Structure formats: C-alpha cells, structure tokens
Amino acid sequence: MDKLIEIDKITAAYGSKVVLKDVSLTVWKDDFLGIIGPNGGGKTTLLKVILGLLQPVSGSIRFYQDGVPVSSLRIGYLPQLNNIDRKFPISVWEVVASGLAAEKPRFRSYTEAQKLRIDEVIRQMGLEELYTRSIGELSGGQLQRVLLGRSIVSRPQLLILDEPNSYVDKRFESRFYKLLEEINKESAI
C-alpha cells in the first residue's frame, strides 16, 4: 500500500494560542480515517494544515504519489455546512462544476467529457431533479450532497470531509455511507 501523506510533529497555532502540538499521522492510499474529538480540539485546524490553508508553526507535511514525494495532491474538500453563503446565486450544476474549475481554462466552457462527469456526479448524489435549482432553495441535506459532489467531481486522491453527516437527512444517510465506500475505492478519505 502506498503512503499518501506523512505529517511529522506538526504544531499549529492561531496567534499565540497553540491548537495542535507535535501531531504526527500517516495516511495511506486506501485509508478511510475519522478524526474525533471535542469542539475546539483542533480537528478543523489539522484539516486546514493538510489543505495548505494554515502554515504550521513547526513540523512537516509531505505528500506522495505512487510512493514518490510530490509537492501537492488533488484534494477534494467538503467544508462544514455553516461556512456556505446560501444567498449566493448559483445552481446545483454550477456548484458541482466548480469542483473542476482548476482543470478548465478561465472563461472557457467545460469540455463534453467534463459536462458528462458533472452530470454523472449529480446523478450519483441523487440530485437530478434539482439540477438547475439555486442552492438557497435546498434543504441542509440536499446542499450537503451538492457540496460532496463538488468535492469528488475532480476524482481527488484525498477527500477531506469536515463534519460530513451533520446535515444529511435520514432518508439519504445509508446511501451517503455507501457512497463514501464507493468514493474510497478511488480516494483516501
């Protein structure tokens, strides 16, 4: 099994407040990991360090592809739902498509293959009937599925989920877990 991420003695802080101290972790290609702890325990901070959104005070993080060190990985990210502006005028299709933004030239249309991939992910999430709806019209669970679609449309090597089932409705919950099992065949979670 190939190593994907190696975190070695990371310390992270916000100003003078240390949130993580000497954290080490190795993530392997087919891993499905959960990080649990109390509110304010540093879970989201660790995710921010992995995503490159927060520079650690000390320690190192290394990424690998096929056992070879690389500067970065394709990472999909599903944020906590409370970080989303529901008033932003964007459709379900556009949100999922935005997960491919780095793969298309600016101000150009998506390729036919990309459009097919976007449509495939929308179907996979069970959102076909909401295709053109604005995100402001969606329930919390529907929006969570849209954001999950955005995070996987690029076929990431690593998928980071921050409180992924907090808004998933009971009707979709078992399908959600099966979906994560399917995604884990292509991505470490």
Indicate where each model-derived feature is located.
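Helix-to-loop junction immediately C-terminal to a conserved catalytic motif
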Residues: L51
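Conserved ABC transporter NBD signature motif
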Residues: G59-I75
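Conserved ABC ATPase "signature" region
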Residues: T111-L130
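Conserved ABC ATPase signature
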Residues: S134-L138, Q142
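Conserved catalytic motifs of ABC-family nucleotide-binding domains
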Residues: R155
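Catalytic Walker B motif of ABC-type/P-loop ATPase nucleotide-binding domains
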Residues: L159-E163
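Conserved catalytic loops of ABC-family nucleotide-binding domains
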Residues: L179-I189
